[in-house]
Amino acid sequence: MLTLGQFIKAVCSMLGPVLVGVAAGVWGNWRLIFPLYALITLLSWLWMARLKVDESHSEPVGARGVRTLLTDGYILMLLSVIVLSVGFEIGLMTAVPKYLSERCSLPLDRAAMGCSLYYLARTAGTFGGAVVLSRISSRRFLTVSMLLALVALGLFMTAADATVLFAALFVLGLCCANVFAIAFSAALKSAPGRANEVSALMIMGVAGGALLPPLMGVVADLSGQWASLFVPGVALLYMLVASLKLKN
């Protein structure tokens, strides 16, 4: 279910730029997309409000209960994987248009298509991951994915041909599509009796999207856009090491 949820999220991310383009073309102002987003959010809330969820009785989640989880090294490692995976994606998507524009002399609007290509691959990756993860262990899957992602990022940083760069982005999207779901699921399995606290802590990991991009910006200002890509590279390397410690 986590992987399926990530699939739906990836589809929404991929459609975001398309909807903005439609709003600009049809209504003449891309900002008019926000009322549409508000309507979709309202309809989603009304739909969810009608659902009945049977939950077992559990104690309310408190800040103290969440903090105690941080003393568990395994949980802390999985949290850091989620932080870095979200930071990797946001940081990379922030850098891709300018990097492609500088690397291949592409117009910025065409270079920005690299982000849509990444999310297209991520959509395919989450869908495929739901099938593959039912057949092999999440540890092996994550290890192979991170190895391929490192190779793809290395190719992205060294190639100069636009086709090769777009292909590398596509592979990156495929390889990084299921990191969040795997880490989240592993955390829940490690402490099944504290699912609420674990869920609350893992969701906090999305804050990683606000951590890596500023660091990449500092590196880019000091050494250029190419050098800033070493930041997500280090994140991938950490996730590779963490995958080797994942419990089957």
List each language-model region with its residue ranges.
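Glycine-rich segments within core transmembrane alpha-helices of 12-TM secondary carriers
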Residues: 1-17, 200-212
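Helix-to-loop junctions at the C-terminal end of transmembrane segments
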Residues: 125-137, 220
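Structural signature of the two symmetry-related core transmembrane helices
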Residues: 140-155
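Extracytoplasmic gate region of multi-pass secondary transporters
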Residues: 73-116, 123-126
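Small-residue (Gly/Pro/Ala) motifs that create kinks and tight helix-helix packing interfaces
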Residues: 12-24, 97, 129, 212-220
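Intracellular juxtamembrane helix-capping segments at the cytosolic ends
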Residues: 177-191
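Juxtamembrane intracellular "pre-TM" segments in multi-pass secondary transporters
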Residues: 53-78
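Helix-loop-helix hairpin linking two adjacent transmembrane segments in secondary transporters
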Residues: 4-53
